[in-house]
Amino acid sequence: MYKQKGFTLIELMIVIAIIGILAAIALPLYQDHMAKAQINRVFYELGSTKTAVESILAHGGIPTVDPSQDGVVQNSRRLEFLGLNQNPNSNLIFTASVGLNSNQFERVNATFGRNALPQIQGAVISFVRDNQGQWTCEIDKSNAAYCPPKYTPATCVTI
């Protein structure tokens, strides 16, 4: 009697089909988790600047992301370097900026770029401070290819 050695062609094709189906399901889920993780990472990196901003404002200064402006007096207020460069060494943040409104601090922004996933590149995450010192988080996804609200942290608002 002849004994079978190995797998038949149909068995191998079934295994390959199962692997293909699993990969088709897993890849989009993986990309979603990566996008969420990258947004959360920048959320916490940028959120760490809130303490420095509060300290600078408490001393009557204006935060800046340009180290060359540190100590410069502008409109009778001293600019102080925030510790976050315009072009940080982050592999996710492309640019960082400070938003002023009538020479008053309003927000700190970070734009996704560099090694961020393509669907979130161009999105801008901002921490906005009101006159009472309350902070809110905003994500402007208008320049991003695909950035659904499910990617954003619970405390952020998408605009």
Curated annotation (Swiss-Prot):
GO BP of this protein: cell adhesion
Claim: Transmembrane is one of the keywords in the record: yes
Listed transmembrane segments: 7-29
Alphabetical keyword list: Disulfide bond, Fimbrium, Membrane, Methylation, Transmembrane, Transmembrane helix
Major subcellular site: other
Membrane topology classification: Single-pass membrane protein
Record protein name field: Fimbrial protein EcpB
UniProt family annotation: Belongs to the N-Me-Phe pilin family.
Species of the source: Eikenella corrodens
This protein's GO CC annotations: membrane; pilus
Cellular compartments annotated: Fimbrium; Membrane
Cysteine-cysteine disulfides: 137-156
PROSITE patterns: PROKAR_NTER_METHYL
Removed propeptide positions: 1-6
N-methylphenylalanine modifications at: 7
Lineage: Bacteria, Pseudomonadati, Pseudomonadota, Betaproteobacteria, Neisseriales
Cited InterPro entries: N_methyl_site (IPR012902), Pilin (IPR001082), Pilin-like (IPR045584), T4P/T2SS_Core (IPR050470)
The keyword 4Fe-4S appears for this protein: no
Signal peptide extent: none
Record NCBIfam families: IV_pilin_GFxxxE (TIGR02532)
